[in-house]
Amino acid sequence: MTTAVPDSRIPAAVHRRRWVILGVLMLSLLIVVLDNSILNVAIKTISTPAPTGLGATQSELEWAINAYTLVFAGLLFSAGLLGDRLGRKKVLLGGLVVFGVGSALAALSGSPGELIAFRAVMGLGAAFVMPATLAVLMNVFERDEQPKAIGIWAGGVGLAIAIGPITGGLLLDHFWWGSVFLINVPIVVLALGLMLWLVPDSRDPDPGRIDPIGVLLSVVGLVLLVYGIIRGGQLADFTDVTVLATSAAGLAVLAAFVVYEKRSDHPSIDMSFFRNKVFSTAIGVIGVVFFALMGVTFFSVFYTQTVRGYSPLQTGLLMLPLAVAQLVFAPRARLAVDRFGNSAVCTAGMTLIAAMLAAFAVLDADTPIWILEVVFFLMGVGMAHVMTPLSVVIMQALPREKAGSASALSNTFRQVGGALGIAVLGSVLSTAYRGGIEDELPAGAPHAAAESIEATLALAARLGERGEALVTPAHDAFLHAMHVTALCGAGVALLGAVAMAVFLPGRPRGGQEGKEETELVAADH
């Protein structure tokens, strides 16, 4: 492996153990990503009536996911600034403790409302963990090693995505649904011990001031907007006064947030960053990737478990190709960038993601399962060749001491993109499903029975023999809704591909290309 000369700002002792530190940082990252990937497998179980689950409706499931995501996204900037000011290690340790406590409380939830609240607590902790891991990484690696380290760090996301659904499936096969949250606690304890022992502290010598007004405006605006979108899907009526009013209020508050940030002398988001088209495109497309990914993951669980009849563990195994592809290709994506350039590699990766999203529109109840496996694998290949290069572009666009802010900005767009993906594509799914099943429901059926396939099948179970006639129409209506939703996600992904083709830089210069390729190849041996 190539060993670079330590930067004068990096102590020699820290430089020597930088790869071990990277491993500890990946463990902390693993906890945050693992939780969301585990939850993806558990959403069907949580939607099952008590005592098996909590009987959560589709809109409550969307909020259980988005309560975490919105708090996470809204506090990332403040978390990054606190890390810059107080020290990234201290903030990382505090975030892990809060995340662990939130996980234990979520496991003991007695209702969907409690689960939503405790997921928000978990989001609070995660907001301090995610940016701190990447900020510490940027302060223990030299600039020429950062792409390699970020590639491995991104591969850790793939590892978490790989083991999350499988772990969740194993837990749900043997324990109650709350075990998918309780599993976080021992991992948090292990990470805290290693962090105290190995990870150095770092801070920005000239940190910015906290921006409480900006944080409040961003969180309130996002919550109102997402509420309006989810409510529209729940009612299957986006012209409802409540839906229009809350969505418009959310957009107005977000507009006020942008105006305030431009005028503030200590903004959460430095709007001058977005004058750089490359930086803006990279940040925006990261949001688009997570918009599509979170939406597809949401409906694919119901497709595999409800329509195809697979268990949670089998569903986790079915998702393995998606994660394996990311794990294998993320650390090597930089080689493709060195050869072909960011624009070509990222555009091709995003186009592949769009094609695989569109492929869901041809899946039905008896499609050979190997086709789904190929779709998941190729989607993972596409993600690896988009996320890793874009992460490098974003992190290297700012000085080392601003690493916390760059990481927070990147992760904010991921989380906001994912939240909007769940809200928008979840609402498309709900609206399309209601349109396909409403005429099949018996007279007097509750309005909620048409909100999701799980609600319809629960009604069918209560009706006994009379309800058996609802099963096939429910499956057919869900498949139609999944096809519509997948095509919407594919369209959004294609817009991201076009943006990257236009704005991202092309192939690097020869000298730099050769140097980076030599180091990356050496790292792989």
Predicted regions and their residues:
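Residue-level signature of the transmembrane alpha-helical cores
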Residues: 28, 94-98, 102, 118, ...
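C-terminal membrane-cytosol helix-exit motif in multi-pass small-molecule transporters
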Residues: 186-203, 221-230, 249-263, 497-504
